[in-house]
């Protein structure tokens, strides 16, 4: 017999002093919650305890799942996109030497992109080496790509570092030389000039390398269900990060019906703790319970270009 879950919490609180120390981890993935994942999990711990399983149903790049594991919480990792769950599992199961193989040149990038049947490693190569992690365009412009790619490769081979690359002799030597000065003098905007010294490929590999920490903690196996596949779950915490209402929803396998999702979430809240991450929800049955003032974005969908803060929503009266 299913019993209705009653959780008496007057308001959602967060004592930031209790947040786990160290960097948040997860795949470099579009829409990742890595910037606020540590806060989200600490909010769950402080307000709803640590004894209930957490279902990360729109898991994406795994930032929430990873944070749950690092906090010793039971978590179920799910995303409808099998490519991303396979990628997460693959990175966690591999070592640093394998991660180094993911960095590729501009030419290789478009060769991989053109492949009809892509492997999980191919998916990761496109993810890591693409602008905005969208797997569409190469990370660097055609004009600068060879120099920056070759520099990144040389730093890996000579110094075996992903982070701290600016302190290496190789980086200092090349960025003060004639080759680097050549493309720094091209007619670029000031903002673009400021970005040129960054080797984003190494920064992406550093993010992947951090996921190695999960190897010693847990064996991760993702599922690839629609959220409807969790309709029988009871007595759990459902963390839901659906496509944003009113956005163009690019990158999602199917068009997403927000109202149908809200109806489902409302029903699930009768027997579970349901937390939705979004910028806004039009359904009046839900209300904001926490706002991340430093986590914002500019939404271009639906003609709304105003900056919005990331928020957590729950059914009114359910907490």
Task: Describe each PLM feature range.
Residues 178-181, 185-193, 202, 217-237, ...:
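Core catalytic architecture of nucleotide-activated donor-dependent transferases building glycoconjugates
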Residues 71-218:
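Class I S-adenosyl-L-methionine-dependent methyltransferase module
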Residues 1-55, 59, 63-64, 70:
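S-adenosyl-L-methionine
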Residues 68-70, 230-234, 280-288:
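Short loop/helix-cap segments at secondary-structure boundaries that form the rim of catalytic
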């Amino acid at each position: 017999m299913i019993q209705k879950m009653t959780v008496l919490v007057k308001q959602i609180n967060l004592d930031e002093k209790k947040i786990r120390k160290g960097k948040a981890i997860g795949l470099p993935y579009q829409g990742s919650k890595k910037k606020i994942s540590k806060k989200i999990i600490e909010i769950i711990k402080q307000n709803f305890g640590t004894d209930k399983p957490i279902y990360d149903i729109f898991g994406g790049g795994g930032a929430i799942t990873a944070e749950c594991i690092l906090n010793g919480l039971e978590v179920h990792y799910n995303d409808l996109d099998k490519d991303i769950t396979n990628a997460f599992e693959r990175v966690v199961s591999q070592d640093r030497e394998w991660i180094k193989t993911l960095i590729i040149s501009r030419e290789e990038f478009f060769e991989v992109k053109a492949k009809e049947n892509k492997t999980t490693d191919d998916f990761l190569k496109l993810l890591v080496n693409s602008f905005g992690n969208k797997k569409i365009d190469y990370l660097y412009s055609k004009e600068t790509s060879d120099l920056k790619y070759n520099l990144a490769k040389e730093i890996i081979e000579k110094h075996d570092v992903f982070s701290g690359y600016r302190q290496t002799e190789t980086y200092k030597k090349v960025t003060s030389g004639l080759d680097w000065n050549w493309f720094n003098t091209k007619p670029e905007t000031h903002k673009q000039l400021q970005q040129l010294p960054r080797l984003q490929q190494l920064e992406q590999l550093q993010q992947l390398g951090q996921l190695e920490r999960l190897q010693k903690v847990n064996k991760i196996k993702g599922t690839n269900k629609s959220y409807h596949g969790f309709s029988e779950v009871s007595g759990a915490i459902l963390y839901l990060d659906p496509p944003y209402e009113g956005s163009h929803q690019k990158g999602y396998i199917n068009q997403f019906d927000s109202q149908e999702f809200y109806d489902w979430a409302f029903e699930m809240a009768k027997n579970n703790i349901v937390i939705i991450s979004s910028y806004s929800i039009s359904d009046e049955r839900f209300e904001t319970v926490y706002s991340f003032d430093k986590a914002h974005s500019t939404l271009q969908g639906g003609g709304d270009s105003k900056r919005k803060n990331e928020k957590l929503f729950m059914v009114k009266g359910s907490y």
